[in-house]
């Protein structure tokens, strides 16, 4: 039942049923970015987002999601060639802070500055508790791409990525 409602969160650690969100997936506003709230949110398919240049946390739960199943990934010939060249080194959780900082750089022309200080701190706390991870792509010891996201059980929720050279974020 979609009633196009947006709920105001309180201090209570709870979310409304995602089916009550608006058609685009906006479910609620307010609340906080505590580890417990973030874990509850992601466990229910809900994620936080700040509207561009606004302070109010928005909680989203779109009904349609893009899901990648590892055993169904097809690596294109050109990507396989790039991997086999050995030009890049890939690491995990070696530079989480660098990844999130680079992802959070203000991109006013794209209205993509949702990853402000509060969000970066929240994801850093998740990382410190083992609930967020990063993937780094290096070229000659220079960070040239990467992504970070939330890890719960066997699921990884990719949040943001960047690439400073062609295809680095695809690796």
Annotated model-derived regions:
Residues 1-171:
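N-acyltransferase acceptor-side catalytic subdomain
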């Amino acid at each position: 039942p979609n009633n196009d409602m947006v709920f105001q969160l309180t201090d209570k650690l709870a979310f409304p049923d995602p089916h009550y969100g608006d058609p685009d997936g906006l479910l609620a506003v307010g609340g906080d970015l505590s580890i417990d709230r973030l874990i509850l949110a992601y466990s229910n398919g809900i994620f936080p987002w700040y509207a561009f240049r606004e302070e109010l946390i928005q909680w989203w739960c779109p009904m349609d999601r893009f899901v990648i199943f590892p055993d169904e990934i097809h690596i294109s010939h050109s990507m396989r060639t790039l991997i086999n060249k050995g030009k890049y080194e890939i690491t995990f959780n070696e530079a989480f802070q660098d990844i999130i900082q680079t992802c959070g750089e203000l991109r006013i022309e794209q209205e993509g500055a949702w990853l402000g200080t509060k969000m970066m701190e929240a994801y850093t706390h998740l990382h410190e508790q083992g609930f967020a991870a990063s993937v780094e792509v290096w070229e000659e010891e220079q960070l040239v791409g990467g992504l970070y996201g939330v890890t719960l059980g066997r699921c990884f929720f990719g949040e943001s990525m960047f690439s400073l050279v062609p295809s680095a974020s695809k690796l």
